[in-house]
Amino acid sequence: MTEIVDIIAREILDSRGNPTVEVDVVLEDGAFGRAAVPSGASTGAHEAVEKRDGDKSRYGGKGVKSAVDAVNGELFDALSGVDAEDQRRIDNLMIALDGTPNKSRLGANAILGVSLAVAKAAAESAGLPLYKYVGGVSARVLPVPMMNIINGGAHADNPIDIQEFMILPTGSPTFAEALRMGAEIFHGLKKALKDAGHNTNVGDEGGFAPNLGSAEDALAFIVKAGEAAGYKSGEDFVLGLDVAATEFFKNGKYELEGEGKSLDPAQMVDYLAGLADKFPILSIEDGMSEDDFDGWKLLTDKLGKKVQLVGDDLFVTNPKRLQIGLDKGLANSILIKVNQIGTLSETIDAVDMAHRAAYTSVMSHRSGETEDSTIADLAVALNCGQIKTGSLARSDRLAKYNQLLRIEEALDDQAVYAGRAVLKGR
């Protein structure tokens, strides 16, 4: 009854107006699953490859018709009649059919769309919400939202080098209250920026993109806005950064052009440590470039006991890259982006591997998103305890937050908000 009878892919648009892949899967019993695939702006060199057409006469070369054709052709032929409840078999069949180490032949966007839609169809067939189907009875921890409320770097057209400045409402008793705190601080920040004469346009992920002079300026505005909203920084909420350092690592130096700084790896570590001393920063993502292992080691040795150091470009949700980090003692947390690795099974493996090594995990969106809220369910299913899904603006971001509100409501008194404990004593 749970055999796959139809797979239909189409080209849709993401939140930046670029094409992406959406996949529908239908099972013999009539169960249906739909998934839309996200896309990143700053991408790691070691990520699985999303397939784009390259035809400049359509969408500037960013069309995904070839990936859609791969789903409707080869992948449908290979998976027709296969039991949707055997997720790992399905994912392995697609990986084998692709035949490349980075899913570049069929496209990670084609493979992931099918992988997630299959899981959703199987969940519907089982009469379970996706988070329970994937995570079982232990899926009850609501994640701390890491809310990106000031954007810089590749996500905004301003002189700030660091890509994301986030608030983590760790002091709330529930996810719903955490979301309220985030929204109140977000609106307070808008007022503070406006009062200071800054623009309040938003970047790709819904955060503000003001023309501030430095990272310190951005952090000071956020702390001020939080305290004006009645919340205490360092207690009710803490701060997080996504440095996206790979984006400005050139010829062995970290080129902070907005601040007029050119730093070697040791100086970059000192720069980040200085920010963490001055502000309640408890999470730093991609503080060093993806292949600057020596720099990562310096950063981990200096800050790893008091700050969560998240590897995004460093690990690209890939167990092989994570193993390098574990062997070398790099970072202490992994960012989980389903489209970096390209299947649900491999995503689960990456989270399991991280948790076994006492690393934390953060479920994450991409800057090019859709209304699909799968990652909200996966954050709960995999007990990540943290989720990065943008700001408190743009419906593509709010879709995930609103789904988490529904999950918390459905879990009722079984729901647990991860809170400060998820940062492991930091």
UniProtKB/Swiss-Prot annotation:
Localization annotation: Cytoplasm; Secreted; Cell surface
Key word Coiled coil present: no
Record's catalysed reaction(s): (2R)-2-phosphoglycerate = phosphoenolpyruvate + H2O
Source organism, top-level taxon: Bacteria
Note on how the cofactor is bound: Binds a second Mg(2+) ion via substrate during catalysis.
Broad class of where this protein is predominantly found: cytoplasm
CDD domains given in the database record: enolase (cd03313)
InterPro entries reported for this sequence: Enolase, Enolase-like_C_sf, Enolase-like_N, Enolase_C, Enolase_CS, Enolase_N
Pathway: Carbohydrate degradation; glycolysis; pyruvate from D-glyceraldehyde 3-phosphate: step 4/5
Listed SUPFAM superfamilies: Enolase C-terminal domain-like, Enolase N-terminal domain-like
GO molecular function, one term: phosphopyruvate hydratase activity
BP GO terms, sorted: glycolytic process
Enzyme Commission code(s) on record: 4.2.1.11
Keywords: Cytoplasm, Glycolysis, Lyase, Magnesium, Metal-binding, Secreted
Region (Disordered): 38-60
Entry function: Catalyzes the reversible conversion of 2-phosphoglycerate (2-PG) into phosphoenolpyruvate (PEP). It is essential for the degradation of carbohydrates via glycolysis.
Protein's name in the database: Enolase
Species name: Caulobacter sp. (strain K31)
Gene that produces this protein: eno
